[in-house]
Structure formats: structure tokens, C-alpha cells
């Protein structure tokens, strides 16, 4: 609510050395939304199999802590003595983690290094080369078969399920920026089908190293500015961020029976795979699928990436559905949490769901960090959409209509129709609604 910007200068693991350019000679971010000390866990709450070393996938313990915190907030106990009929769905797929990198260093990278040394020193005795290899191995974290498996996707999800005493399906998936929506969609399906009575859905973007940032910079327009203002008139690119979120889901009847605190209802989720579909088509699909008039949505937690062409698509989509504003007509508030924490990549839609759910629960329209010069299409009286520069009470004109919010997300390929045709999912919408029992 304080419109705080949490972007900070890159740390030593992400910054470029002075005087160097990134691999693609493209703009490289100078700031990022970083987890810092938040990337932590409470060891006593988790069954560590051994002492953790630098060669293990420590993302796992952070994700498990997030899952624990979500369960506790929902009134459930991690390490329940009786198995829970529950499922775990996680959006998580960094190109590498500490575990996989350590194994590459012990194998392929070590072989390449020794090959280079042999080429530069062809007359070196084999005993000396063996000693060099031994010293290189000693400088690395000790390899461990269990830690290697925990660096893979299937063990990642099953570990969390075991720690939470969930006896059902546990999967890790990668839908890019839409991973949060995909995880939530699968979790809802688990509940509807009866496969689970409780579902954990989450998405995670762990600390981003330089190698990952350099790779992303080849395809994503990054901004070199120190702040990100979604829907500003002049945009040059996005600023990355780290983060994660987990949600505990139940069928509404079960949640009310158990007297749970309900932050929001998931009314509909739509993920578009057709390159011809623009955000308005996906938003219409999401609202029509749950028989919700689109103009009853009062808040759009937008993608708002800072990429000009992507933001223009979102604005056009909203104007296409809401039309030109007329006196007494419905208005829809727009904002994006990316101005506060950056673009958290696979966790971006999960971050949007957190913000929108809390907005519904507290009946407050939350502000975003306001741009000095808002986009012309939003800063005029003819627009049915407006940017939230200040927090305001969420007042509805119709006492019989519940408050509703839509969370939008788009993969970076959404602005490239040719490339998008070969990819699985371009944009997504999650429609949330306040719980009527809370409202009354």
C-alpha cells in the first residue's frame, strides 16, 4: 500500500564485471527485485537428509518453507501424522541450479578444463596433470547422488509432498511466465475431479545468476533504468525479479465447513495457445467460461511488464471489451505489482494472484508505483480503465454483485506470432471473486 519499490542493485552473482559486455551485446539490467535474506528456511521444520552443502539445490528448501508457511496460514499442519489426500503443483524450471551445475563441474566442465590445460601445456607429465585434476575436484562441493536427484523436477515436487504429508499427485511444470496459472489450473482440476481434497499450487523464481540473466537478455528487452513504471508513456523494457508463492486450495463447501479463512474464490482460468488470440480473447474466454459479465470485473492485475508492445496489447484488450467510457458506466482499475518487485518470470502470475486476493479480502484497490507520464490511452476521460496511483476503498455500485479481479499474464513470445506458434501458451487470465460469506 506504501507503493514501495523493492528493486536493488545487482549483487556479485548477477552483475557483469566492470568493462565487459554481455554475450548478446544487448541491454543488461542494473537493478533487480531480489529475495536477499528472504531466500531462507527454518531447518528444524524440514527433514534435511544430511548437512546441506553448496552443491545442493537450495531452491528446494526455500520452496518447502513457502509451502509450510501457506499450510500454517490455512490452519493445516506440515508433517501431519496421517496422510492428507492432497496434490502439489509447482511451476519451476530454472535452466540450472546449484546441484546440476555442480555435477557439470565434476564431469563435462572438468574434462573440458583438463583438455584446455593439455593443449596449452602439451609436455606436462601425466602425474602433474593428475594433481591439477585432483586439486580442481577438491575445490568443488562434494558430489552426492541424492543431491543430484533433488536437483531434478520430479524429486523437487515429491519432496515437498512428502514433507507436507500429501499422498496424491505431485508435479513440477514449466509454462514460462504462465507457470503460476498452469499450476493453479491443475490444482483446481484435482479438486473438481475428487483426486484431492486439498491442493498446493505455487510458482518459484529463485535467485537469478548472471548466466541466466545473460541468456534472457538475448530474447527479452531489459531496461537499464533504476525503476519500473508499468504503463508509462515511454518504455524501454522490463526489470527482472525473484520470488515465489504457494496457495492452499479447497473446494468452497469444504472450506466453509472447516471454517477456513477464504481470501478469494477461483472462478475461472483460461490459457491461450492460439497465436491468433489476443489478451481480449483470453479474458473473454475466462469470464464467459464462468458466466461472469466481463464488465463486473473491477480490478485488473495486469502483466504490465514495461515492454511497450506488450503493454499496448493489454490496453487495447481492455478497451476492446469495456469500450469507451460513458457517464455512469463501469470503470476498471489497472495496476501491476511488477513496479514494486520486478518481473518475477515464472512466479509473476502467482505474485499477481497474491496481490489480487488480498485486495478482494481487504476490499481495497491497491496502488501501483505511478509513472510521471501515464500511457496516453489510460490518461484520458474516454478510457474505461484507469491506473491506480493511490489506494482506495473498493466500493461496488451494485450491492448484489461481488467484487471480482482478473490477473493477466503473457509469455515473452506473445509479441512474436511466428515464434509463438511453436510454443505452449501465449497468455493467461485468472478470474478471482470475493467470498460471499466474508462479504456478508
Task: Pin down the residues of each PLM region.
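Condensing-enzyme catalytic core of the thiolase-fold
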Residues: 1-440
Amino acid at each position: 500500500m506504501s507503493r514501495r519499490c523493492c528493486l536493488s542493485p545487482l549483487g556479485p552473482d548477477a552483475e557483469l564485471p566492470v568493462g565487459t559486455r554481455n554475450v548478446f551485446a544487448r541491454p543488461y539490467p542494473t537493478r533487480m527485485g531480489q529475495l536477499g535474506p528472504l531466500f531462507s528456511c527454518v531447518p528444524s521444520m524440514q527433514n534435511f537428509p544430511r548437512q546441506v552443502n553448496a552443491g545442493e539445490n537450495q531452491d528446494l528448501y526455500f520452496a518447502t518453507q513457502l509451502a509450510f508457511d501457506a499450510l500454517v496460514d490455512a490452519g493445516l499442519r506440515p508433517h501431519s501424522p496421517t496422510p492428507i489426500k492432497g496434490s502439489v503443483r509447482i511451476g519451476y524450471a530454472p535452466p540450472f541450479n546449484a546441484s546440476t551445475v555442480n555435477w557439470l563441474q565434476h564431469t563435462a566442465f572438468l574434462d573440458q578444463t583438463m583438455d584446455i590445460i593439455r593443449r596449452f601445456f602439451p609436455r606436462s607429465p601425466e602425474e602433474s596433470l593428475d594433481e591439477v585434476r585432483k586439486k580442481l575436484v577438491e575445490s568443488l562441493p562434494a558430489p552426492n547422488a541424492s543431491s543430484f536427484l533433488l536437483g531434478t523436477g520430479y524429486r523437487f515436487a515429491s519432496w515437498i509432498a512428502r514433507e507436507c504429508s500429501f499422498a496424491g499427485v505431485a508435479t513440477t511444470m514449466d509454462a514460462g511466465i504462465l507457470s503460476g496459472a498452469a499450476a493453479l489450473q491443475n490444482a483446481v482440476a484435482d479438486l473438481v475431479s475428487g483426486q484431492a481434497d486439498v491442493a498446493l499450487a505455487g510458482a518459484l523464481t529463485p535467485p537469478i545468476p548472471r548466466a541466466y540473466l545473460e541468456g534472457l537478455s538475448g530474447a527479452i528487452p531489459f531496461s537499464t533504468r533504476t525503476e519500473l513504471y508499468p504503463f508509462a508513456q515511454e518504455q524501454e523494457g522490463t526489470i527482472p525479479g525473484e520470488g515465489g508463492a504457494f496457495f492452499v486450495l479447497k473446494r468452497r463447501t469444504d472450506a466453509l465447513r472447516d471454517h477456513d479463512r477464504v481470501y478469494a474464490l477461483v472462478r475461472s482460468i483460461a490459457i491461450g495457445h492460439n497465436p491468433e488470440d489476443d489478451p481480449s480473447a483470453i479474458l473473454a474466454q475466462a469470464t464467459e467460461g464462468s458466466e461472469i459479465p466481463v464488465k463486473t470485473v473491477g480490478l485488473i492485475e495486469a502483466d504490465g511488464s514495461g515492454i511497450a508492445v506488450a503493454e499496448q496489447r493489454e490496453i487495447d484488450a481492455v478497451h476492446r471489451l469495456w469500450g469507451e467510457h460513458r457517464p455512469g458506466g463501469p470503470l476498471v482499475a489497472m495496476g501491476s505489482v511488477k513496479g514494486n518487485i520486478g518481473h518475477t518470470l515464472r512466479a509473476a502470475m502467482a505474485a499477481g494472484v497474491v496481490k489480487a486476493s488480498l485486495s478482494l479480502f481487504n476490499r481495497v484497490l491497491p496502488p501501483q508505483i505511478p509513472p510521471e507520464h501515464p500511457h496516453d490511452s489510460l490518461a484520458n476521460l474516454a478510457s474505461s480503465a484507469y491506473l491506480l496511483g493511490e489506494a482506495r476503498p473498493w466500493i461496488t455500485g451494485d450491492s448484489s454483485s461481488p467484487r471480482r479481479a482478473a490477473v493477466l499474464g503473457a509469455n515473452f513470445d506473445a509479441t512474436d506470432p511466428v515464434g509463438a506458434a511453436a510454443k505452449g501458451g501465449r497468455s493467461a487470465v485468472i478470474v478471482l471473486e470475493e467470498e460471499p460469506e466474508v462479504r456478508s
